[in-house]
Regions:
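Short phosphate-binding loop-to-helix
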Residues: 48, 54-112
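N-terminal glycine-rich phosphate-binding loop and ensuing alpha1 helix
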Residues: 2-50
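A structural signal for short hydrophobic beta-strand segments in well-ordered beta-sheet cores
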Residues: 22, 141-142, 213
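Conserved alpha/beta core of the MobA/IspD/sugar-nucleotide pyrophosphorylase nucleotidyltransferase superfamily
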Residues: 74-75, 166-240
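Conserved core of the sugar-phosphate nucleotidyltransferase
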Residues: 102-191
C-alpha cells in the first residue's frame, strides 16, 4: 500500500473548452504541466492521471505518464474514489487536471496536514477580495476557530448584519481523504445542496464527515475557457 497517491482527474468533455486536458499550453498539453508539477512533490510511482477518455490514456502511455482508465465520473471526487478501488493508498490527494499552475508547495502542505488515521476531508482556503466574493465561479467557505468548515456556497458568504462584505475565503481545490471517507461519500449519492451548486463539499458535510480547511498560497489559475490559456502562458513565461 502506498503512503500517498496523487490523483490527477481529467476528462475531454467540457462545455466551455472541449478537449482541454490535451490543449497545448506553452509547448505541452495541459495535463503534462500538472504531471510535471506533481513530480516536484513525489516520485512518479505515487502519481496517476485518472480519466474516462482513451485520447488521454494514449497520450499518457506515449509520454511515460502513469494513467488509469475509469468509468465515467460525476466529479473529481467520484473519479478519485474509482481510483481508490484499484490502487491502495493510505491517503489520496486530488490535484485537478485543469490547473497547470498548481502550486507545488500547496500540494506539500495538504499532504503534511493529512492523517490516515482520521476520517476527514481536507481542502485548501485563501482569503479573497470583494470581486471574488461576488463571483459565483468561486466557492466560498465559512469555518470555525478549529478550521472546520461549516458551510460552502457559490453565493457571497459570510456577510455582516447589513448584508455587506467584510472578509471571506474561497476554497482551493486540492483535497485529501482516506479510502473510508471516499467510500462513505460515494455510497450516499448526490445530496440536494450539491445538486444545486455542484459543490461536492456539501455531501461530506451532510453525511457528517469533518471537513477542515487550511491556508494555502492559492496562486494557481484554472483553465476553464479559451481566455485562460493566454493568462497561464503569460504566467509560465514569467517563471522562466
Amino acid at each position: 500500500m502506498k503512503d500517498i497517491l496523487i490523483v490527477i482527474p481529467a476528462r475531454m468533455s467540457s462545455s466551455r473548452l472541449p478537449g482541454k486536458p490535451l490543449i497545448n499550453i506553452a509547448g505541452l498539453p495541459m495535463i503534462h504541466h500538472v504531471w510535471n508539477r506533481a513530480l516536484q512533490v513525489t516520485s512518479s510511482d505515487n502519481i496517476v492521471v485518472a480519466t474516462e477518455d482513451n485520447e488521454i490514456i494514449d497520450y499518457c502511455i506515449t509520454n511515460d505518464i502513469n494513467c488509469i482508465l475509469t468509468d465515467k465520473a460525476a466529479s473529481e471526487v467520484d473519479r478519485v474514489k474509482l481510483v481508490s478501488d484499484k490502487i491502495a493508498a493510505k491517503i489520496y490527494i486530488c490535484a485537478c487536471g485543469d490547473e497547470p499552475l498548481i502550486n507545488v508547495e500547496d500540494i506539500k502542505t495538504i499532504i503534511a496536514k493529512s492523517d490516515s488515521s482520521k476520517n476527514q476531508f481536507i481542502i485548501g482556503r485563501k482569503s479573497i477580495d470583494e470581486n471574488e466574493f461576488n463571483d459565483p465561479s468561486k466557492a466560498k467557505i465559512v469555518f470555525d476557530e478549529q478550521n472546520r468548515v461549516l458551510y460552502a456556497s457559490r453565493a457571497g458568504i459570510p456577510v455582516d448584519y447589513k448584508g455587506q462584505f467584510q472578509k471571506a475565503h474561497k476554497a482551493i481545490w486540492i483535497h485529501s481523504y482516506t479510502k473510508n471517507v471516499l467510500d462513505s461519500y460515494f455510497s450516499q449519492g448526490l445530496c440536494s445542496a450539491e445538486s444545486l451548486d455542484g459543490l461536492s463539499i456539501h455531501r461530506f458535510l451532510q453525511i457528517g464527515i469533518p471537513v477542515y480547511c487550511i491556508d494555502l498560497i492559492g496562486d494557481s489559475w484554472a483553465v476553464d475557457e479559451p481566455k485562460d490559456i493566454k493568462i497561464v502562458e503569460d504566467r509560465l513565461r514569467n517563471l522562466h
